[in-house]
């Protein structure tokens, strides 16, 4: 099969543009690996390419969920893997692009997910409602310190999942993670990044553009489609901050600074995660000739 290319890295580095140019060069099709770009109607806040900007290149795993549906790594892994194999079977090159860390690792390392038990999960969800996310995070720290250290103390959904896995398997949550070996399908992996100060400025401009382009109106429109009922969609960067500002009696504009700060924090987490992967060939987003560099990396993988 045609060897895939994965273009990964922090938010705001230009991954989509590079992937698009690469796909044009090699006759490729794009497979999205941004969790929130899976949602229909979540366009401005996720910097999703418009149909016109996609230049006629097929895109997969975009606009496949309604905001009331829960985005899961397991669903994505199965669907995206099927897309990649179908693309390759028709002689095109799969180009994976995104910055959602678990999505990318699950796809390239064939992550095997532990079983789930609705009763056990319901128990911890009830516990979350009873004692709050901070206290439940502390409980996780007592049974699996490593998992607690890797999960934000505000991420109730992942805390519940970690406790569920620990109870069902009797092993630490990390034991279910894949080992980093040869990437699936012999995929070439490119990481795109910028100098920190430059990327911070890019993120500031990106955030300003989202609000200027109508992010608040997009959130208001999505409320009519059930955004508040979405377990994952309502927590997306930008959307969660706008909702909080609206709930506090604001007009949404007060969410700009919290969105920027949250995005910078997320970028730090992305960098920390991706830099652990020795398979990634890093490129400077400021360099000229990025597509040629990507082609060299892709052709060099054996």
Swiss-Prot record:
Function: Catalyzes the transfer of a dimethylallyl group onto the adenine at position 37 in tRNAs that read codons beginning with uridine, leading to the formation of N6-(dimethylallyl)adenosine (i(6)A).
Top-tier EC class: transferase
Sequence similarity: Belongs to the IPP transferase family.
Cofactor(s) for this UniProt protein: Mg(2+)
Assembly and interaction partners: Monomer.
Catalytic activity field: adenosine(37) in tRNA + dimethylallyl diphosphate = N(6)-dimethylallyladenosine(37) in tRNA + diphosphate
Example of a GO MF term: tRNA dimethylallyltransferase activity
Native organism: Mycolicibacterium smegmatis (strain ATCC 700084 / mc(2)155) (Mycobacterium smegmatis)
Marked site (Interaction with substrate tRNA) residue numbers: 100, 121
Assigned keywords, A-Z: ATP-binding, Magnesium, Nucleotide-binding, Transferase, tRNA processing
SUPFAM superfamilies membership: P-loop containing nucleoside triphosphate hydrolases (SSF52540)
Binding site for ATP: 9-16
Binding positions for substrate per the UniProt entry: 11-16
Transmembrane region(s): none
Domain of life, source organism: Bacteria
PANTHER family: TRNA DIMETHYLALLYLTRANSFERASE
Protein's recorded name: tRNA dimethylallyltransferase
Keyword Cell membrane among record annotations: no
A Pfam family it matches: IPPT
Native organism taxonomy: Bacteria, Bacillati, Actinomycetota, Actinomycetes, Mycobacteriales
Coiled-coil portions: none
